[in-house]
Amino acid sequence: MQVIVDGRTIRTLRPGEVTPEGVKLREINGASAVFEIGGRAIALSLGQSTVAETLLYADPRGHFVTQARFNGVPLMAVIDTGASYVGLNAEHAQRLGIDFRRGQRVVERTANGQIISYLVILGSVQVGEVALANVAATIQEGGSDQLPLVLIGMSFLKQVEMRRSGNTMTLSRPHLQ
């Protein structure tokens, strides 16, 4: 059976097989199939899809701050549509086990001027139920005094659908079709 995972990757599965994204085909029943995603069984008819969706609430200053997972490690983060990449500091990189100085050295322009950062690829970024693999990120030298929260920038956000209504933001993306 062919399935589209994360809205873009076509995978061919037989019952019992698992995709690199963690989707398992349990069984096929004529015009429907049962999948296992994140430990949950989901029955879908042919042509039906499932969407990963996360609802965020703005803090009193209007910022969308949330706990997210980067390479499986939970860190506090803020949605930042003005940031080109997911942005981390050296302390975050250490917690993730990333030797960021092996990344590509880049100059970034920020509200506080130019800074030197290192471009790396994160294996996974997950905000609530919405998860992506291989997301570009930049890591600044320095610690939480310069960049206290991880910035969830456009390298993640451009791959999801983002809707804002008042003080709520919904992030979503097709998970399985």
Language-model-derived ranges and their functions:
Residues 1-177:
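Pepsin/retropepsin-fold aspartyl endopeptidases
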